[in-house]
A protein has these predicted regions:
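N-terminal Sec/SRP start-transfer signal
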Residues: 1-27
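Alpha-helical membrane-interface segments at transmembrane helix boundaries
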Residues: 22, 37, 41, 253-257
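Hydrophobic, regular-secondary-structure patches
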Residues: 30-111, 135-139
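Extracytoplasmic
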Residues: 50-52, 105-110, 139-141, 157-159, ...
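Soluble periplasmic/extracytoplasmic beta-strand elements of cell-envelope proteins
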Residues: 56-58, 92, 109-114, 143-145, ...
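The feature marks short, hydrophobic/small-residue-biased sequence motifs that occur predominantly
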Residues: 95-138, 182, 199-202
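Mid-to-C-terminal secondary-structure elements
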Residues: 121, 148-195
Length: 257
């Protein structure tokens, strides 16, 4: 009888130990999954920010558009207001225009992101897989940075030239053609970016759209402390002209939260 009782106690202890271990492993698995999820979410947040900025300043009319429909003046007053904000790390001017890359046998729709000469290319160092970044230092550059996806689909490599077609602002007449040289190739790992986004000279878009040299599509801002982004966005909004809006990245890409 005593032996039977000891046996039961031993079995019960083992069951309890197994149950405790199972609970511990279950909690550990949940914590690991949560940590992995947070890590993945952080990576998505960081990558999305690198290619899109933390805060966008643009006209209200451009809010719902992926392209720069209407330009505004790049002026010292707005730039000064941006610089005065202590959470702003850096910023630059951009404009976005839809187009089509075409080779002899293939074509792909693209989003041409024109950036100003002070664009910080080092932010894309980790994504550059071949070649170099476009040189925007002097005259209007004909160099572009494209993704591995576009390079593969269009059978392009560094040094190749490719024609790009852009719809006229009036939507009348034949598209405008520009020939660019592939300076570099990047890979973000995000299909939404790699499938369409290429980088080039902001002045190309100004010329294509017949904008004045001081007209831009948006300012792209990067912050020092991401946790203060909403507060920073509000501060910027209250300091810039009323026709301009400031938009935090999570309003444009809600999935990164």
């Amino acid at each position: 009888m005593q032996g039977h009782k000891q046996y039961k106690n031993t079995v019960s202890a083992r069951i309890i130990n197994i149950a405790t271990l199972a609970v511990t492993l279950g909690i550990s698995a949940i914590l690991i999954a949560m940590a992995t999820s947070r890590g993945l979410q952080k990576e998505i947040q960081n990558k999305t920010s690198v290619f899109n900025g933390h805060i966008l300043i643009t006209l209200f009319e451009n809010n719902e558009s992926q392209v720069s429909v209407l330009p505004f003046e790049d002026n010292d007053l707005v730039r000064q207001k941006i610089r005065e904000n202590k959470n702003i790390k850096r910023f630059h001017s951009i404009a976005l225009k839809a187009g089509m890359l075409k080779t002899n046998s293939h074509f792909e729709g693209v989003l041409f992101k024109g950036v100003s000469s002070n664009f910080d290319w080092s932010s894309l160092d980790a994504f550059l897989t071949d070649g170099k970044f476009p040189d925007l230092s002097n005259t209007i550059s004909k160099e572009i940075l494209i993704s591995e996806t576009l390079a593969r689909q269009l059978d392009l490599k560094v040094g190749d030239q490719t024609d790009t077609y852009f719809q006229r602002q009036s939507n009348q007449g034949l598209p405008k053609k520009r020939r660019f040289t592939v300076a570099g190739i990047y890979f973000s790992g995000f299909p939404d970016i790699d499938q369409t986004l290429l980088y080039g000279d902001l002045r190309q878009i100004q010329k294509l759209n017949r904008w004045e040299k001081n007209m831009i599509g948006a300012y792209e801002l990067f912050v020092k402390d991401f946790s203060l982004i909403q507060n920073t966005t509000d501060q910027i909004y209250n300091s810039i002209p009323s026709e301009l809006n400031s938009i935090p990245i999570f309003d444009r890409f809600p999935s990164i939260l």
